[in-house]
């Protein structure tokens, strides 16, 4: 008989957000039976919006009470077997005082453990008093959890250092390649390179600007640098078409919990030039990694792409086999087996 998972989060973030997407994919895969031996019991969440005071009250007071009551009712009523909280920013919701197993997905620890990477501050180094209290509640919640499920090896190692007695499992994100291999249409011309992400400093788009400035003039004349997210908004279908049309995704980030654009690009057959930093260096094929601050290495890699584009007669690229093969390693079947093993371990210990 399948064990029933009660999924818990805070605000009902949409699929378009990073944490929202991960949550919805977990819901979908539980419903589809893609985690062997487990099925969805229910989802506990609240609506978003409201003024700052309303949001604080909901986060710190009303929703934790709602979750506690719902967990009690589900366990007592026999409709759920354990609780899974779908991101570390909701770890304060780990039930206290209830005899129920609980796991938490940890996407990253940037805010709980801010750091400086290659001179760039990652995470909030100066939280205000309210946020400091909130972070303490999150730490306490993670300490109460029976299992932490990390989406990367690098974050898992941090978890083991912070909570050395806590069981930690690694379950990388997975991807369904089919939508990424349906040929799309987008009006991009010339020598196309992509960046995907926000303008926040850790994404290091300023480094890409420096690399572009250092390119030979003939490469710059042909270059069509498309900055998705920070400058240009695309639909999901348009983004897939952009990956298919691009010579490469440029991903110089100083730090990621996972680096989903890297996996998406490879699933679409798009090569990647990525900084050799965690955790996206666990995702990209090793041949696609570059020293994060070596501008010359990035310039030379782009020149090679430009030469290949010229030799091809400036035709759009064909899907890159290295990218496709690497993306295939992050398949949903393996993901489901690893998630099931993580859940199983809570009941074995």
Please annotate each region the language model reported.
Residues 1-349:
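Carbohydrate transferase catalytic cores enriched for Leloir-type hexosyltransferases
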